[in-house]
Amino acid sequence: LPALANIFETSIDLLVGMDTIRAEETRYNIHKKAVEYQRKGDYDSAEKTYREALLIYPNKPGMILGLASTLALKGNTDEAIELMERGLPISINEKQKSTMRATLCFLYLKAGYEDKANRLASELPHTRESREVIQPLIQRGLSEIEINENIKNILLGDGKGIW
């Protein structure tokens, strides 16, 4: 491997994918540290952690949205909105996107953009599609008839709208 790394002028870590694994671990630890600060109410430290991380990972949606969430908690509404609008389109984490969209509704409202808040809220998932509704049903052990009824309810909803 060292000879191969020399030929391609790269590191052994890069050849075997360790750099990617280390980067993921590093990003995870950054989030862990920042969220710990957030939960303690130390938003300044959480903000500093994310701002420093963005110097290394400027296009990672998790870092962008992490800073946005910290700023939202601090009350820095305008910058939080800007970062969420920047981070949401590039995020592939559906849970993260859902949480950020819901938060963004309230940030829009806080900033006086009621129309934007309503428009975004109308695109959020229905309660019937949430894990709080679906997981208890799964754990209850449904009959095939009940399963089919739930599929119908999710797909057709209350019958008042298309989606």
Language model features by range: what are they?
Residues 58, 92-95, 126-129, 158-159:
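Short coil turns that delineate tetratricopeptide repeat
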Residues 25-56, 66:
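Alpha-helical segment of the N-proximal tetratricopeptide repeat
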Residues 37, 71, 108, 139-142:
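Residue at a conserved register position within TPR or TPR-like alpha-solenoid repeats
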Residues 33, 67, 104, 133-138:
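Structural register within alpha-helical repeat arrays
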Residues 28, 62, 95-99, 130-133:
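Start-of-helix register in tetratricopeptide repeats
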